[in-house]
Amino acid sequence: MEATNGHQNGSFCLSTAKGNNDPLNWGAAAEAMKGSHLDEVKRMVAEYRKPVVRLGGETLTIAQVAAVAGHDHGVAVELSESAREGVKASSEWVMNSMNNGTDSYGVTTGFGATSHRRTKQGGALQKELIRFLNAGIFGNGTESSHTLPHTATRAAMLVRINTLLQGYSGIRFEILEAITKLLNNNVTPCLDLRGTITASGDLVPLSYIAGLLTGRPNSKAVGPSGEVLNAKEAFELASINSEFFELQPKEGLALVNGTAVGSGLASMVLFEANILAVLSEVLSAIFAEVMQGKPEFTDHLTHKLKHHPGQIEAAAIMEHILDGSSYMKAAKKLHEIDPLQKPKQDRYALRTSPQWLGPLIEVIRFSTKSIEREINSVNDNPLIDVSRNKALHGGNFQGTPIGVSMDNTRLALASIGKLMFAQFSELVNDFYNNGLPSNLTASRNPSLDYGFKGAEIAMASYCSELQYLANPVTTHVQSAEQHNQDVNSLGLISSRKTNEAIEILKLMSSTFLIALCQAIDLRHLEENLKNSVKNTVSQVSKRILTTGVNGELHPSRFCEKDLLKVVDREYIFSYIDDPCSATYPLMQKLRQVLVDHALVNAECEKDVNSSIFQKIAIFEEELKNLLPKEVEGARAAYESGKAAIPNKIQECRSYPLYKFVREELGTGLLTGEKVRSPGEEFDKLFTAMCQGKIIDPLMECLGEWNGAPLPIS
């Protein structure tokens, strides 16, 4: 594109091709959506981990904003020197227009509804602008509940620099360098949490950045170690080798009249939302594994016929996780046993998870692109067009893209949470979970172990709050500033509420993943216990039922196969706490097999030597003597890490997440016999998620995916 205001304007979304055939920018917006969502998330992660962010006003990403905001990463910010001339040109234009007597909003006029007032004292006007906008309330201290989180402030500073670098705002480059030094030295101004409607930008909070730069006595900052600083101390710690800035005409307005606080926080939120969206896809696949689901719900033809790209990708990701899964192979065999007595289809939380998650991923992805456009936009007023020698009075400060994107994202997060809660509820319910114990209890005595019962109550609470937060913010607009700002975006408020939703979804995700790991371990225990029961039943059958008292072959020798079928069919946790109890299904059904064979034995039952009925009591007595010891031995071997059958999860693509939770975080199987509470384990994972540690194992689960569904065969 043509050079304007002294620099090349190749913006984040505008096509720069010669003879631009996309004047409305729809083509560029569509182009940005090409490729898979997962590939985009991988690019975000790579950008997030780069040590330097170079700002030129045109290519800032939400991942870079998130990286700089989390200052513990030590990401350095650099300004593009090529932007200096454009910034300087617009600043000089403002001074020249003032000297020439040109009437410009915010330079010679009052503000908002009082713009009919006039003054020639341009510097004093900017000083008053910052003073009257310092209307926030902080409460006690710099870490109070009324102070914007310092990470969000850093995000806002970065975005505001990026906007002003484009050279349409009339501000000196030196001021942008000063803000950059604050960022690079981890000196963060204190901004008020509330008080902006993001409609003439985030006026009130941004005024506190300007207040620090101009040395206002009420301004405060926080240093790298959390120490409270006044403006002078902040300048010294940030190595800003100048006096406080005396704002020139338009410079105060340039600092405050933008959407950077709302869009900065939105960037942080969306970086996490994209990660959580991918996590929800993988967790749904693990849910299918431990629930012994039918993997045909991921078949590509089903989703191809629905056409929605988010759904197609979600299904393909789940299909990739489940393809070759040892759980799916075992489940297939289980489904072949008594198929007419089992549901033909899985419940919706499993079977329709791609259809549910797909549109939500599309919403999050579209919101990401919208906010990425916003943080690369020029969003103040008036705009200085040096090339045409004029100031343009418009409304780019209206943060509607933020409010709408955040409302939509929050709705998507709430729906992800709803699915997660439905899946969790099935997982802990022994009426639905295909043989896992109620509440995922793992103790020998289920009467003294209630497992994840408290966790399910907590999940209901999280889900309810998340659903409440899904209500829109943007429908609550109030006319403000003497009815000049009569429509306003509420962008920062919506970003804040979405940030709350992110935290709640993390609580749900950490609780759910710990529960899934518990279920994985219970399936491992189940397999070993069932193996022990089968071996014992087989051993007792051979010993008791093969021959008669005189060593002759006995008719009961044919019972063994059917007895083992009973063990295969019966859920192990329905009887394993007392396997030989006459009131539990194992002994009842083993006896029924022997009775049925005895009835078929007919006339032979009259002979004591060939009677199967005569064998029943002996068989049961032998089983009662042997089975409890064998079961306890199998459980003890499992608990000591010497299980006869290894854990299936090691052969699955979902293993990296399990390994991360169990080995890196040091969590374990929860039982009523141990002191450790579920919440302690949830806390470990939640903290790790907040630190971004879950990203690598999550991506490792999908490392082999080629970005396409399996062929339809």
Curated annotation (Swiss-Prot):
Its main location: cytoplasm. The keyword Phosphoprotein does not apply. There is a cross-link at A199-G201 (5-imidazolinone (Ala-Gly)). Keywords: Cytoplasm, Lyase, Phenylalanine catabolism, Phenylpropanoid metabolism. Its EC number is 4.3.1.24. GO terms for biological process: cinnamic acid biosynthetic process; L-phenylalanine catabolic process. Pathway: Phenylpropanoid metabolism; trans-cinnamate biosynthesis; trans-cinnamate from L-phenylalanine: step 1/1. GO terms for cellular component: cytoplasm. The active site is at Y105. Coiled coil: none annotated. Contains an active site 4-methylidene-imidazol-5-one (MIO), which is formed autocatalytically by cyclization and dehydration of residues Ala-Ser-Gly. One of its GO terms (molecular function) is phenylalanine ammonia-lyase activity. (E)-cinnamate binds at N257, Q345, R351, N381, K453, E481, N484. The modification 2,3-didehydroalanine (Ser) is found at S200. SUPFAM superfamilies: L-aspartase-like (SSF48557). Pfam families: Lyase_aromatic. It is found in: Cytoplasm. It catalyses: L-phenylalanine = (E)-cinnamate + NH4(+). Belongs to the PAL/histidase family. Homotetramer. This is a key enzyme of plant metabolism catalyzing the first reaction in the biosynthesis from L-phenylalanine of a wide variety of natural products based on the phenylpropane skeleton. PANTHER family: HISTIDINE AMMONIA-LYASE. This is Phenylalanine ammonia-lyase 1. It comes from Glycine max. The lineage of its organism: Eukaryota, Viridiplantae, Streptophyta, Embryophyta, Tracheophyta. The gene is PAL1.
